[in-house]
Amino acid sequence: MASQLLVPGRRRTARHQHVRGQLLGAHHGLLRIEAGDLHWLLPAGHVAWIPPLLPHALIGAEAFDGWSLYVRADAGLDLPPLPRIFQPDALLQAAVTRALRWPHQALDAAQARLAGVIADEIRASTPLPFALPQPRDRRLWRIAAALARSPDDLRSVQAWAAASGLSSRSLA
């Protein structure tokens, strides 16, 4: 199953999961993927792999234009068990472009072969260091969440410390 994604502005999906793995690509904009204790940034021109059954949320701070393909978990494809962001090569881009035109029905033999190529490209991809660990301390987490919502917030260390109940020395 494939779909185009057009998000006109700020948007956040509720935390959810898919029975299928999700391959998510960005043409324009920036998307943040929250999964567990990590957040991944998906910039334009890159692709995210989200394994099946991984609870996640998608957050867009601006207009986003991209696409999504879903990969059956039972396909025996031995795909990566952890999320990753990577830069697609020309082969993956061409295969995805074709797959996005497929009707929502069972794959024929040629489509199944191309889906296998897409799976090969996911397996062969090199993860990029776009994962951001999230703090476990509730006070630090509130600061990180506020900065994620408004990255242009220019509060000083002292102001953040006062707002979170930490000393500025602890925060620095």
Language-model region placement:
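N-terminal regulatory/effector-sensing and dimerization cores
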Residues: M1-I85
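Solvent-exposed, flexible loop/coil residues
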Residues: R11, D89-A90, Q158
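Generic anion/oxyanion-binding catalytic loop in active/binding sites
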Residues: R12, E34, L132, R149, ...
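Short beta->alpha linker loops
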Residues: H18, D37, L53, R113, ...
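An amphipathic alpha-helical interaction segment
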Residues: I85-L154
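Basic/polar phosphate-binding segments, predominantly the helix-turn-helix DNA-binding elements
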Residues: L154-A172
